[in-house]
C-alpha cells in the first residue's frame, strides 16, 4: 500500500452562525487507503468531507492535495467525486446514461464512453443493466449506479457520505464488503463518512474518530478497538466497562478492590488511571474461581451471546458471554492481563 499523503488538512476552523464546527483540525489521509471518518451527529465528519470536496471553504486553515494548496479551488477542478446517501441519480435517464453523464460533459467520443461505461458496470456487478430504468432498480442497485457514475470519471479520491444509511441491514452488510472490494480493485483513496462503528471497523484501513470538531484518535480498526486513546473512544467504539483504578507499578493495576496483572507499563507508581475492559473479555466462572464476584441483575439473549448486567463492588458491569445465567445468580468474573487496557486519567 502506498503510504504517501494525498490529502492534508491544516489548522482547519469552520464556524456556522457563531458555532465552531471544526476546531483547529489537522488530518493527513494516505493515498490508496480506505479511510473512515467516524463520529456521532454534529462531530464535524460531513463538514470535513465537504471541505475536501470543495463544497465548503474553511474560515481559516488550508486544504492540501499532494502538498498543493487547493483551499479555494472549485469542486469541478478537483480530482474528487462524491457519493451521497441520496444518490441523486437522474430518473429520466437509464443506467447507461446515468453512468455516462460525466463522460459526456468531458465531450469524450462515443466509442470511449461506451467502453468506459460498460467496463465500469462490469466492475460494480451491473453488466447487462445498461438500458434498465433507474425506477426499476433496487436500493442496492441504485447505489452501485451512483458509485459507477463517480468511478467512471477516474477520480483520485472517492468521497462517500453515509451512502448505506437508506439500505436494510442485510443489504448494508453486503455493500460494506462490496465497497471494500471496489476500493482495492480500483486502487484509489476512499474517504467514507459514517456514525456506524461496525461499518467503520469492517471496511477501513484507517479509522478517524471525531468528536466536537476534533480528531480523538486515528488508527487501524484493531488499534481503535483494542487500544482506545481516551474514554470517549473506548465508549464510542463498541461497548466498554470503564472503571477507576490505580497503577501500582508496571504490569500491576488495582480496581474494584482487587489487584490484577496487566500488560501496561510506563505509568507513575500509584498513578490514578482509567481501566477499560470489553464485555466479551470477561470470563464467567464460579464465585470461588472469580477475581471479582457479582450478582446478575438481568440477562438479554442476543443470538450469539447473552448480555448480562452484573452488580459488583458498587458498580454495574456489562458482560457478553455464551454461558446462560439467571437474574439473581451470584457469579465469578475473571479478567486476563491481555484483556485490561490502561488509560491515563488526563486522556479520559
Feature map (PLM): residue ranges:
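Conserved ABC transporter NBD signature motif
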Residues: 61-69
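Conserved structural motif at the start of ABC-family nucleotide-binding domains
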Residues: 7, 22-24
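The feature captures the beta-strand-to-loop junction immediately N-terminal to the Walker
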Residues: 38-40
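Conserved coupling/switch loops of ABC nucleotide-binding domains, chiefly the family-specific signature
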Residues: 59-62, 112, 212, 244
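ABC ATPase nucleotide-binding domains
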Residues: 34, 75-85, 89-232
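Helix-to-loop junction immediately C-terminal to a conserved catalytic motif
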Residues: 53
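Non-catalytic connector elements of ABC transporters
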Residues: 240, 251-348
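ABC-family P-loop ATPase nucleotide-binding domain
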Residues: 1-13, 287-289, 346-348
Amino acid at each position: 500500500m502506498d503510504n504517501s499523503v494525498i490529502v492534508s488538512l491544516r489548522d482547519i476552523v469552520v464556524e456556522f452562525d457563531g458555532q465552531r464546527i471544526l476546531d483547529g483540525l489537522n488530518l493527513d489521509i494516505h493515498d490508496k487507503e480506505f479511510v473512515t471518518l467516524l463520529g456521532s451527529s454534529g462531530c464535524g465528519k460531513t463538514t470535513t468531507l465537504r471541505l475536501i470536496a470543495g463544497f465548503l471553504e474553511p474560515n481559516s486553515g488550508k486544504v492540501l492535495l499532494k502538498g498543493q494548496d487547493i483551499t479555494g479551488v472549485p469542486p469541478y477542478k478537483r480530482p474528487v467525486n462524491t457519493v451521497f446517501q441520496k444518490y441523486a441519480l437522474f430518473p429520466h435517464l437509464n443506467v447507461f446514461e446515468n453512468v455516462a453523464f460525466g463522460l459526456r460533459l468531458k465531450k469524450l467520443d462515443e466509442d470511449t464512453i461506451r467502453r468506459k461505461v460498460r467496463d465500469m458496470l462490469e466492475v460494480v456487478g451491473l453488466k447487462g443493466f445498461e438500458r434498465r430504468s433507474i425506477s426499476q432498480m433496487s436500493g442496492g442497485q441504485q447505489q452501485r449506479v451512483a458509485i459507477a457514475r463517480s468511478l467512471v470519471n477516474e477520480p483520485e479520491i472517492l468521497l462517500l457520505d453515509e451512502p448505506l444509511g437508506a439500505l436494510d441491514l442485510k443489504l448494508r452488510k453486503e455493500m460494506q464488503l462490496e465497497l471494500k472490494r471496489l476500493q482495492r480493485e480500483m486502487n484509489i483513496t476512499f474517504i467514507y463518512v459514517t456514525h456506524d462503528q461496525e461499518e467503520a471497523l469492517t471496511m477501513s484501513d484507517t479509522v478517524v474518530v471525531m468528536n466536537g470538531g476534533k480528531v480523538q484518535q486515528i488508527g487501524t480498526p484493531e488499534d481503535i478497538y483494542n487500544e482506545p486513546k481516551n474514554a470517549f473512544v473506548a465508549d464510542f467504539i463498541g461497548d466498554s466497562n470503564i472503571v477507576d483504578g490505580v497503577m501500582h507499578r508496571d504490569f500491576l493495576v488495582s480496581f474494584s478492590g482487587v489487584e490484577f496483572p496487566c500488560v501496561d507499563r510506563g505509568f507513575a507508581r500509584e498513578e490514578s488511571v482509567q481501566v477499560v475492559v470489553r464485555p466479551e473479555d470477561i470470563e464467567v466462572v464460579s464465585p470461588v474461581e472469580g477475581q471479582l464476584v457479582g450478582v446478575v441483575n438481568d440477562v438479554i439473549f442476543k443470538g450469539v451471546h447473552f448480555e448480562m448486567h452484573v452488580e459488583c463492588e458498587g458498580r454495574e458491569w456489562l458482560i457478553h458471554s455464551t454461558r446462560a445465567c439467571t437474574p439473581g445468580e451470584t457469579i465469578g468474573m475473571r479478567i486476563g492481563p491481555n484483556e485490561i487496557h490502561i488509560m491515563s486519567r488526563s486522556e479520559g
